[in-house]
Amino acid sequence: MPLDPDSSPAPPHRDWFFPPAPPFLPSSRARTPRAPFPSTSRSSNPYSFPDRRPPPTPRSRSRSPLPPPEQQKQQQPPPTTPPPAPRRRDPRYAGVRRGDVRTLTAEKAAAAAAVPTAAQVHGSKSAASATTLRWSGMVSVAAIVLCFSSLVRSNSSLHDQVHHLKAQLAEATTKLQSCITESSMDMSSILSYQSNNSTSQNRGLKNFSLLLSLSTLYAPLLILKYMDLFLKLRSSQDSEEEVPINKRLAYRVDIFLSLQPYAKPLVLLVATLLLIGLGGLALYGVNDDSLLDCLWLSWTFVADSGNHANAEGFGPKLVSVSISIGGMLVFAMMLGLVTDSISEKFDSLRKGRSEVIEQSHTLVLGWSDKLGSLLNQIAIANESLGGGTIVVMAEKDKEEMEADIAKMEFDLKGTAIICRSGSPLILADLKKVSVSKARAIVVLAEEGNADQSDARALRTVLSLTGVKEGLRGHIVVELSDLDNEVLVKLVGGDLVETVVAHDVIGRLMIQCARQPGLAQIWEDILGFENCEFYIKRWPQLDGMQFEDVLISFPDAIPCGIKVASYGGKIILNPDDFYVLQEGDEVLVIAEDDDTYAPAPLPKVMRGYLPKDFVVPKSPERILFCGWRRDMEDMIMVLDAFLAPGSELWMFNDVPEMDRERKLIDGGLDFSRLENITLVHREGNAVIRRHLESLPLESFDSILILADESVEDSAIQADSRSLATLLLIRDIQAKRLPFREAMVSHVTRGSFCEGSWIGEMQQASDKSVIISEILDPRTKNLLSVSKISDYVLSNELVSMALAMVAEDRQINDVLEELFAEQGNEMQIRPADLYLREDEELNFFEVMLRGRQRKEIVIGYRLVDAERAIINPPDKVSRRRWSAKDVFVVITEKE
């Protein structure tokens, strides 16, 4: 069969994979292969790769490489059958063979293997393309700036030419209309020529000014934008990454604005000057005015954005609008700076950060529940001076302190209270409140743990003594523990006066338990509302005996002498025959320091005592409800005061073994107790059945202590004390004999007959209850209800602090009156000094008291509710009753 490719058509089974040729493709003759395709039998398992032999790769137009001839010979199987006749091939698929599938797969694998190499090439070229783009951007920005500059320059040139033509036209018109001589016309033409020459000379300067302003404006922006690019090009690729110049510049600006106090106003001033200067240069480039006029015009555009409305021409209008926009930004910045400055100033004033410029003021350091009473007492003391200044510094917000003080609602009486926020441990804060110029510094104890509070007070004293300017006034320190007093005085030296609040309340409770009524007397003496202690020198009294000095003051009561020869020591209740020497001062009880003065001796009758006897002491039974930190000190003081055979019952929830251990650790020696016997009872003071186990009706005095071992806050301790008080009074009222008869005799008043409060008031006739109240508000509540005989609170401590702050010498007097040795304040019956219905004036009663080595300072009538200290009219005679009582200062027995 002849192999004619044109005569025989392509067999249909050869085109089973390829689609028919499109009609528009031209037909071409296929190339004749050099060797015919081998005839192979189809395997029964076409997917069995080990038995499958690939056909030899024919020569085609494919780019895949052909194996060498030796390999082709090895791969070609021996012919088993004669080769078939060559068939006509489709010209559309010339060069494509069925055996090329593996070759195509190899080509795809090679192409896939070549892909990572192309990606690497592309990545290596990305940096170069980015650099090219950045340079292209730089060139574009520079071209835009140059185009804009050329447009502005062309516009200004056209504008100048128009003006020049108008000027020439006006000149020509003038020449035609006027009839002037030829010489004058020649002169005007010469002047016009000179002006044209000067205009052409100034035009170059104006163009330079315009370009200078634009370049100055855009050059920093371009430098900042492309500075990092320059640095990256100069640095090597292996070097460490550096911080961009933009970030470094922003950091430097931030540091400058943060550290320099005047940085923001300085930046605003520089920005304003740059805007005026660049705007003036730009206006000079587009206007015919002089440079000074353009600078002034630029300032007017900055100051008032509406001034650019009169500009003519495109160039002047564009520059004017730009300057006005910059001026608005500058004034917005200035407004923001002014607003921030005013806000910071008001915020500083609101938070109490400003300095106090005061002198001879009272400085209070710290914050506690005693602050209200302290401020009230100091304000009353300053009333005679026309008011004063009190500065309070604590670690609280100023507004919060002012709000708390406003809630106290007491009359300041002309005294100004200034609050500042700060720490007394920081010298800068102490200088802020003018600590060196204060006449007195009061350090309040913190609420909470006593040792921590005293430790902080000690650090505060160290800070105060470290002030370089020195202290003009003295330091009054409130301590919580008596054991820490020695350490604080050791650190502070002569500048420090201490008031141990816990010890003061404990000793007052013991005195009031022995002599009911002393609490009210101490409130009158310690407070500035009535009479208090004053020390003053009176030269006219030198050479006079103390017995005569005693009756020399119609409006005061002398109590002691400050002896100059003893180094200023104060002697309470001196001997009658002591003669005042030069430099001695007199201690008196008076209403104020300017309300008393010595007067001539009055005429008095010196009588004799009705009987000379010593008031016998009888054994007493006292109950302590609760536990205090200084219980051992109270026991020792009570043992010194009571008669032999007395009993002290201790009722609290502290186990008995723990009580003995705490008392021994506190320094109590049980073997040294001579007059009292301790009786321990364990129980809860707010549980009724526990209280009913006690013989409450047999106690002479009951002391309800603020149980600090159970409660932490003052309000919780007061609530517990109030509950104990009500339970004890109710149990006593139900145990009294003839309760119904006694209740029926209750005086009609605030409470109706048979009420439980009336029963409690009747029960108070049998025993006295002394309640320790920490919060003054609770004290006022109990005082109004009258269910407790006497209430002692922190208000007494505040009074003592205020008195010592006004005069530090009074602290020695108070310490002696509170101590178990020396002189004390007592209440005596009237029959010790006079007879029934005897008429005497107060001076004569005072002289009767001197026969017992006592100083009578006041009295309380039988039908009166309160005692009168320092009676106003001491020369008026009156009839006394044997049931009246006198308040005296006498030596402890």
UniProtKB/Swiss-Prot annotation:
Q: Which residues cross the membrane?
A: 132-152, 210-230, 266-286, 318-338
Q: Which domain of life is it from?
A: Eukaryota
Q: How does it sit in the membrane?
A: Multi-pass membrane protein
What is the protein's name according to its record? Probable ion channel CASTOR
Q: Is Transmembrane among this UniProt entry's keywords?
A: yes
* Residue ranges of coiled coil: 156-178, 389-415
Q: Start and end of every RCK N-terminal domain?
A: 359-500, 619-792
Tissue specificity field: Expressed in roots, leaves, stems and panicles.
Can you list the disulfide-bonded cysteine pairs? none
Q: What does this protein do?
A: Required for mycorrhizal symbiosis.
